[in-house]
Amino acid sequence: MAVPKKRTSMSKKRIRKNIWKKKTYFSIVHSYSLAKSRSFSSGNEHPKPKGFSGQQQQTNK
């Protein structure tokens, strides 16, 4: 006889979601560094991908 599945708890959902987010973040960082190393531009800084948390420059106004 078929038995309904148990509901996944919120904490398990959150843990799995965070693991997925970490994997995607590190793949973005890796692809960005690879693209940066292979670029043949003459000193032009390419824009960083959205969500990249590298060093931020401070502007004084």
From Swiss-Prot:
Q: Where is this region: Disordered?
A: 37-61
State the SUPFAM superfamilies in the record.
Zn-binding ribosomal proteins
Subcellular location(s): the record lists:
Plastid, Chloroplast
Predominant cellular place of this UniProt entry's protein: plastid
Recite the UniProt keywords alphabetically. Answer: Chloroplast, Plastid, Ribonucleoprotein, Ribosomal protein
Q: Which GO terms describe its molecular function?
A: structural constituent of ribosome
- Any Pfam family hit: Ribosomal_L32p
Q: Which GO terms describe its cellular component?
A: chloroplast; large ribosomal subunit
The protein's name is: Large ribosomal subunit protein bL32c
Species, as recorded: Agrostis stolonifera (Creeping bentgrass)
